[in-house]
Amino acid sequence: MSSAIERKSLDPADEPVDEVLQIPPSLLTCGGCQQSIGDRYFLKAIDQYWHEDCLSCDLCGCRLGEVGRRLYYKLGRKLCRRDYLRLFGQDGLCASCDNRIRAYEMTMRVKDKVYHLECFKCAACQKHFCVGDRYLLINSDIVCEQDIYEWTKLSEMM
């Protein structure tokens, strides 16, 4: 389950910080270190307030409050995306090399086939594809536009 992280600012003009609970900024307690939050900037996640340095992944320790990071909270653990996928994601097999694809790896998907990025290349000339390149999927083989005729002819001979 992914959770939103809200960045808050502690400014005397912004009292109270939490409109629902009517908590004044001086009474905020960090969900990590249990100390009072006196910093100007702090975070709100999992229904708690946090110092920016205290909200971190329970496994690798990376900071979860950084811009662009997502917090995953499952079974009482705060996790970064990589660790969440490592623990709860599903692995698969590459349609080209038949080796394991870990849940956190970047992949290319064509119909029901999944490929490692390094395996997503023309079966004939071994050229890696770029965005916008045209190709044809023949069985589990990916063939670039330039090699389609030769590859089809070769396949018919076998």
UniProtKB/Swiss-Prot annotation:
Pfam families: LIM (PF00412). It comes from Xenopus laevis (African clawed frog). Signal peptide: none annotated. This is Rhombotin-2. One of its GO terms (biological process) is positive regulation of transcription by RNA polymerase II. InterPro entries: LMO_RBTN_TF, Znf_LIM. Expression becomes restricted to the ventral blood island (VBI) as the embryo develops. In late neurula and early tailbud embryos, also expressed in the dorsal lateral plate (DLP), the site of definitive hematopoiesis in the tadpole. Expression in the DLP diminishes during tailbud stages. Expressed in circulating blood cells of tadpoles. Also expressed in non-hematopoietic sites, including the tailbud region and the central nervous system of early neurula embryos. SUPFAM superfamilies: Glucocorticoid receptor-like (DNA-binding domain) (SSF57716). The keyword Oxidoreductase does not apply.
